[in-house]
Amino acid sequence: MSERGNRKTQIGVVVSDKMDKTVVVKVDRLIKHSVYNKYIKRSAKYKAHDVDNSCKTGDRVLIVETRPMSKDKRWKVRQIIERNA
């Protein structure tokens, strides 16, 4: 499967798997405060397409940007990096 261009990728943790073929992935990132020079953790939640319904809550996954699949869903699960034990 060839891909066009360089698509954005994110690594995050699945926080919800209650929807059919969709998971909610929480992605954390660190930003540096401009005045205090302290690193602050920021997080964002993305809805991602899970074709096989194979992701479970707590799994660490790699998501890749894709075409819009619905109103909120613009990411697709590429691989499960680590299963929740």
UniProtKB/Swiss-Prot annotation:
Family: Belongs to the universal ribosomal protein uS17 family.
This protein's name: Small ribosomal subunit protein uS17
Pfam families the record matches: Ribosomal_S17 (PF00366)
One Gene Ontology cellular component: cytosolic small ribosomal subunit
N-terminal signal peptide: none
UniProt gene name: rpsQ
Record's keyword terms, sorted: Ribonucleoprotein, Ribosomal protein, RNA-binding, rRNA-binding
BP terms from Gene Ontology: translation
Protein function: One of the primary rRNA binding proteins, it binds specifically to the 5'-end of 16S ribosomal RNA.
GO molecular function: rRNA binding; structural constituent of ribosome
NCBIfam families in UniProt: PRK05610.1, uS17_bact
SUPFAM superfamilies attached to this UniProt entry: Nucleic acid-binding proteins
Subunit structure: Part of the 30S ribosomal subunit.
HAMAP family from the UniProt entry: Ribosomal_uS17_B (MF_01345_B)
